[in-house]
């Protein structure tokens, strides 16, 4: 089974001005595509060549895991954002955030602090844990909650420097602030609904 680069659900300029076309082009067509190409090279003629991407993420380690997880994480990140998104949450995710964090503003502040305070490269996640509570998680490098079994991902934000350096240089806080204008709450609601059924 050849791993392919998932198609973006919006144009490269669709997230502008918050994330520029130049950033998205490099991030998607160079970084994300690079992980796909590298993984296919690494798994050729191994048992992983017959497995799905998700199974590779769950079962692998080392370079194979790093590339597989980065493919999965990036696809989830693209889907966590969209044009004409952002603003306040709605539907079940709004109610669940209020239940588990007290208010959307509390959640937004806590999540932003985690994203801005994370040392080095990694990811910030909103996830549903084993007690059916929403939690904020941070993972280093290619890590994710699926591999760590710490929760079911609901949303993610990429905090590797390549996600924001063209647009914001070393100002991660401005990138995080801009990211809130792109959050796809419909995607979060879909993930929450599926996660609550498990």
From Swiss-Prot:
Cofactor(s) named in the record: Fe cation
CC per GO annotation: cytoplasm
Pfam family name, one: Sod_Fe_N
PROSITE patterns given in the database record: SOD_MN (PS00088)
Reactions catalysed: 2 superoxide + 2 H(+) = H2O2 + O2
EC number: 1.15.1.1
Binding site for Fe cation: 27, 74, 158, 162
UniProt keyword terms in alphabetical order: Cytoplasm, Iron, Metal-binding, Oxidoreductase
Molecular-function GO terms, alphabetical: metal ion binding; superoxide dismutase activity
Primary role: Destroys superoxide anion radicals which are normally produced within the cells and which are toxic to biological systems.
Subunit structure: Homodimer.
Designated name of the protein: Superoxide dismutase [Fe]
Lineage start: Eukaryota, Sar, Alveolata, Apicomplexa, Aconoidasida
